[in-house]
Regions:
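Catalytic pocket-lining loop regions of alpha/beta-barrel enzymes
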Residues: 106-212
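Mid-domain alpha/beta scaffold segments of enzyme catalytic cores
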Residues: 1-126, 146-148, 168-170, 177, ...
Length: 212
């Protein structure tokens, strides 16, 4: 870039880009990786500067498919063998109808679901990481997942999603106490790291989006 920052390379995280509506979900997640790998190849030409765009790719895969997800993971790797690094599973949901779920529409308790665990077990043999996007009430479930699979690298997204809307409105102290307790416990899992960002979303309840 010309901003003065020396951005050597970037990592792409799944966002449902370029899904073909005529394809099944198994094919759609591969559509995205194919698209992003093409952008990375364009970047590698050097025509757009020195920064290596999408040098790492984190895609999506339906781990609730259990053992059947293995073929999907292998297709991701075959499409981008040098760049594909892991998957993200969007588990962020809450039964409170005033709190939006992610576009993935996850089921409740997905991180402790047996079929999910069956699918999750296919990450370690392929040296793939796991990006966890959940709300703070789901942190205990993520702790269970991290302990069950200690050899799989887990990256916590968005500070663990502290909520400040819906039934959590005006409950900052209660929310922080719960969040702090479980973030501290999660930090004891040596296979877990945290990615900083995503604390200014509407769901966090700071209402910064209303400022003029």
């Amino acid at each position: 870039t010309e901003s003065g920052h020396n951005i050597v390379s970037t990592v792409f995280i799944e966002c449902g880009a370029m899904y073909n509506p005529e394809h099944s979900i198994e094919e759609q997640v591969i559509n995205e990786t194919e698209f992003v790998n093409g952008i990375a190849a364009m970047s590698n030409s050097g025509l757009y500067g020195k920064t290596k765009i999408a040098e790492g790719i984190v895609g999506s895969a339906p781990l609730l498919f259990g053992d059947k997800v293995a073929n999907i993971l292998d297709k991701h790797i075959s499409v981008a063998p040098k760049r594909f690094k892991g998957i993200r599973s969007q588990a962020a949901m809450h039964p409170d109808g005033t709190i939006p779920s992610t576009r993935a529409r996850p089921i409740e308790g997905v991180y402790i679901n047996d079929m999910f665990h069956q699918g999750f077990a296919h990450l370690e043999p392929r040296n793939l990481s796991f990006e966890a996007w959940c709300y703070h009430p789901q942190l205990p479930q993520l702790i269970q997942l991290a302990r069950k699979f200690p050899n799989t690298s887990i990256i916590l997204n968005h500070f663990g999603g502290p909520l400040g809307i819906g039934s959590f409105t005006d409950k900052e102290e209660e929310t922080y106490s719960f969040w702090e307790k479980h973030i501290t416990e999660l930090s004891k899992c040596e296979n877990v790291v945290a990615k900083l960002g995503g604390i200014a979303m509407e769901i966090n309840g700071f209402k910064w989006h209303l400022n003029k």
